[in-house]
Amino acid sequence: MKITEPIIKEAQEKMTKAEDSLRRELGNIRAGRANASLLNRINVEYYGAPTPLNQMAQISVPEARVLLVTPYDKTSLKNIEHAIMASDLGIAPMNDGTAIRLVIPQLTEERRKELAKQVKAVSETGKVAVRNIRRDMMDALKKAQKNGDLTEDDLRDLENQAQKVTDESIKNIDKITEDKEKEVLEG
């Protein structure tokens, strides 16, 4: 029975990582409110190397729909502005010479529905990842049984345990998705 504990534990850890990945991915979908995580994926050309924006500037939220990007090095202001314009955010940066303001526009009803669909698609990708982890876990358990490390009864018990772990992870993903959809649709 001991040989299978790492299999279940590893699968649980992978499922938790899949949930965390989903949270990060959904965090990039903006819901009409300013959130510093919107800028996490932006890299700025800095002394010839692409550098994450959050490593070269302070990002704050002075108002509900405004992000303020204050670079640590004022000479990088233009590069930051260009990187934001080149991104897929669809937000025009306003450079005041010392910082960049990003005003998040109000979302239209149509755009909210589009974002809700995007949330569902990202969520489904997370569920597929969890199911793939479950499949790999089941394969490993069956292999252990085939090698004589498990009895039929042990295998059945562990398969039930694996299913519970999977169901819990899917339930967490559904909750994360529901919360994000509500955030997007209500704005």
UniProtKB/Swiss-Prot annotation:
- Which family, according to UniProt? Belongs to the RRF family.
GO CC annotations on file: cytoplasm
The UniProt entry lists the main location of this chain as cytoplasm
Describe the function of this protein: Responsible for the release of ribosomes from messenger RNA at the termination of protein biosynthesis. May increase the efficiency of translation by recycling ribosomes from one round of translation to another.
Protein name stated in the entry = Ribosome-recycling factor
The entry lists its GO molecular-function terms as:
ribosomal large subunit binding
* Pfam families listed in its UniProt record: RRF
Q: Does the keyword Iron apply?
A: no
Compartmental location: Cytoplasm
Q: Which Gene3D superfamilies match?
A: 3.30.1360.40, Ribosome-recycling factor
HAMAP family noted in UniProt: RRF
